[in-house]
Amino acid sequence: MLGFFAVYGNPITHSKSPFLHNYAFTKLGLSGYYSRILLDKGANLRQNFLSNGLSGANITLPFKEEAFNQCDEVRGVAQNIGACNTWVLEDKNHLVGYNTDAQGFYECIKEYKIKNALIIGAGGSAKAVAMILQSHNIPTTLINRSVQNLSFFVHKGFECYVNSEFKPTCSYDILINTTSAGLNDNLLPCDESQLKELCSCGKYAFDLIYGKCTPFLALAQSFHLSCSDGKEMLINQAALSFELFCKQKYNKGNLEIQRIASFMNEIL
């Protein structure tokens, strides 16, 4: 048995991760099982993981920073991001954290030839997106509804503003919503007039929310921006996580990321 896996979040009923991972297990002939777990408090994340006997997990909103703080070791880009979306249990109780959101996002936009970017939000997903853009030398600005969480980005050298104080002084090639606005409501991630001004001179709009046309994307479409939801990013990060879940017990030569992603794309 490869093991039991799950995705943690709140809310979590919308998550398609179980479909993706269980389908990939089936296609590859692996005896793994993946489910969803609703968690009320992030402080209980590690305890819940261990008590459920999981071998690995994905972590989504709003627990990615908690996941970073509660694992025993952090590897790869997650060390700079300060947020983990993937946990893998090594040995008996050694919990290793990774971030596959960053590369999963970049795979979606690497062909866009972006000169600069604006990120809306300042949570764990924003950290992943911002840091991968910075690693590719793409100037990036962040805006958030409050000053909370912006200090991380300021220390990393990003230009940051509170929404109410932000006045665009240039156009941005891509607008990226990393907030939960539009997931279970009809809210925009920032003021409508502000967003209209940004869309009027933008090229691309990307919403990390997947499976629906959010108010953010609907507004961007009305300005004829090229729009993408988070489906491709979901598949990319899931395939990267899947490889991490399996690599200790499965022949890595058969775990090409693109092959896993193609399986997952069949089911979503």
Curated annotation (Swiss-Prot):
UniProt keyword Iron-sulfur, yes or no: no
GO biological process: amino acid biosynthetic process; aromatic amino acid family biosynthetic process; chorismate biosynthetic process; shikimate metabolic process
Disulfide cross-links: none
Keywords: Amino-acid biosynthesis, Aromatic amino acid biosynthesis, NADP, Oxidoreductase
E.C. numbers: 1.1.1.25
GO annotations of cellular component type: cytosol
Keyword set includes Iron: no
Pfam families: Shikimate_dh_N
Active-site residues annotated for this sequence: 64
Enzyme class: oxidoreductase
Domain of life: Bacteria
Catalyzed reactions: shikimate + NADP(+) = 3-dehydroshikimate + NADPH + H(+)
NCBIfam families to which the protein is assigned, alphabetical: aroE, PRK00258.2-5
Task of the protein: Involved in the biosynthesis of the chorismate, which leads to the biosynthesis of aromatic amino acids. Catalyzes the reversible NADPH linked reduction of 3-dehydroshikimate (DHSA) to yield shikimate (SA).
PANTHER family: BIFUNCTIONAL 3-DEHYDROQUINATE DEHYDRATASE_SHIKIMATE DEHYDROGENASE, CHLOROPLASTIC, SHIKIMATE DEHYDROGENASE
Similarity section: Belongs to the shikimate dehydrogenase family.
Protein name: Shikimate dehydrogenase (NADP(+))
Originating species: Helicobacter hepaticus (strain ATCC 51449 / 3B1)
Organism ancestry: Bacteria, Pseudomonadati, Campylobacterota, Epsilonproteobacteria, Campylobacterales
Gene: aroE
